[in-house]
Amino acid sequence: MKQNNYGGFFMENKALNNRLIIISIFVFLFFSALTLKLVNVQIINKDKYKKSLDDIKVDEVYSTSTPRGRIFDRNYNLLVDNVGVRTIYYKRKPETSTKTQIELAYKMADKIDLDYSKLAKTNLKEFYLVNNKDKVNKKITEKERELLKQRKITISDINNMKMERITDEELSNYDEKDKKAAYIYYLMNKGYYYDEKIIKTYASNEEFAYVSEHVKELKGFNVKLEWERKYLYGDTFKTILGSVSTNESGIPFELKDKYLSEGYSLNDRVGVSYLEYQYESLLKGDKATYLLNDDNSYTVIKDGIRGNDIVLTIDINLQKEVEQILTEEIVNAKMNNANTTYYNGSHVIITDPKTGEILAMASKQIVANNGEYKVYDNTPALLTNPVTPGSIVKGASMSVGYKTGAIDIGTKMLDECVKIRNTPAKCSWTKGLGYLDDVKALAYSSNAYQYKTAMKVAGANYYYNGPLTVPESAFETYRKVFLEYGLGEKTNIDLPVESYGYKGTSYESGHLLDMAIGQYDTYTPVQIASYISTLAANGNKYKLHLLKEVHEKTNNEKMGKVVRNIEPELIGTVDLEQKYKDRIKLGFESVMKSLGYGYMGTVPSPAGKTGTAESFYDSDGDGKIDVPTISKGFIGYAPSYDPKFAITVLSPNVRYSTNSEYTSPVNSKISSRVSNKVFEILK
């Protein structure tokens, strides 16, 4: 007989129902409690909780701009300062409607003189649209509205249609006042709504006073003193000092990612070139911080403060003299010297070889304009425009010979033409120099001595008009030593742009001989300045730099205390025995008694090296060098026994290679005058 299980089934059902009842009661009580809590928070104690929220919610707003740090020269002459600029700005209030904004734009159009030439047609259409909403809305068809409802087009598509359908005829009804108001309206709404919008800088006294006296009725318009950079020495060194973006431009597009990642706002004024860019983190000011109150007023939390003042290594009085000398001599050469068809400027760099400090650096370019010559600053070329150095590299070339054992102190060789099969003969600049030792080879700038040394370095077997084979390693032997002097590598000077120069890619034997006399690889003027500085400093290569001191931030006229001194940074040494370094120095001293006589004016105990290079010029601007020219160079230092300064003077394409042998003396004139001026100022 089967057992009856119905009783067990009903017992289980009853237990399940009891559990459901208990859960339902619990859920009911939970939501009842939650409802009571919400009533308490949102109705009964609303003000209490709102106050608590306000206590922990702080709306901090930052001012738009703070003056940058000032820039001084090494003698604390002020180079770059900030000057106040009367500025009218607009900051939209939350309750301000579009209609009110339009009214304000027209009111301001009556009161301020504003150039609206930058008003784009799109901006004018936008102004027309907000002024004629009903009329413009009728330009959208019912079919298009239906497509919008069906989400087949977007509201953005609709707005674009409206803009496209506003006709030129409709816009032609706008007069000058309308256009000025349209431009003001555009400026009022440019960028983020919560930003201060610059409406006009350099406002007149009357405009400034009007806005100041009518702040309440102008609802968002106000005035303040903004700042602009002032250059106390005019255009002297101005290019390298750099530039700062305007209120209107804010962060340039190409620098947007960099600056936004560092916490900047799009409308911030930032350094965009050279030293202003390089030292943006020091020069930028700290913005004032305000607390946004419930009534939209502001309470100052933290005052703004000017950026760090910085002191440069530059001597501005020397810089000014160098630029003046360059300008005078370049113009004189172009107007009065023959064979200067393709000569268009010269370069000068003055350094302290014991520290790497740059005392002056300038390059000037001359351009014919309507029959007259105009001179422009070209100082960035010192960093980016490589030159063929010629014989000025022979000090480094001698180092290669000594280091490899190819030559030694007193090694003599006959100065004679070298001829490799199927190539033209390679000779010195003049004949009859005879047998020369290492010092006289420098003094008389013997090419043959360097050719023969290079062949020894390469382990090559040479005979006149025979084949010559050299290993690639010989090129690298030269380049390695040249690098120790700073030739062929970036100097990493504290400026944002610099190039390497050109490194030849052919390893033909003749090119090794060319390299030994500075006719193969090319170097930037700043690399050549590093080379002569290293040689003058007994083989110690100090990093070239322009920053000397950083001072703490302050709003006072007086500079803050020094927070950072830039110490000389030794970045390398020339691996060469002292006796050989002394021999090269002796050769450089001998140069100044022969080919280099007068190149350093009347400066006592000079040492240096002249250079002549066969170069080429792109005569038609097509990117191809097509005209053979001659370039001149000079490097030196003084006094030879305790160098106080090193000088680099380069004049590319100074002679057009015609049948005439005449070469303008512009390079020696610049070098002589500048050297005298340096000694006069520094002694």
Locate predicted features.
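Short, solvent-exposed cationic patches
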Residues: 95-115, 325, 375-393
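Membrane-proximal periplasmic segments of bacterial cell-envelope enzymes
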Residues: 2-277, 281-298, 302, 346-347, ...
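Short, gly/Ser/Thr-rich active-site loops of penicillin-recognizing serine hydrolases
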Residues: 557, 665-683
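A short acidic/glycine-rich loop-to-helix N-cap element
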Residues: 653-670
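Solvent-exposed, polar/charged alpha-helical surfaces in well-ordered, non-transmembrane soluble domains
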Residues: 99-110, 209, 213, 238, ...
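Conserved, well-ordered alpha-helix/loop/beta-strand core segments that scaffold catalytic motifs
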Residues: 196, 295-341
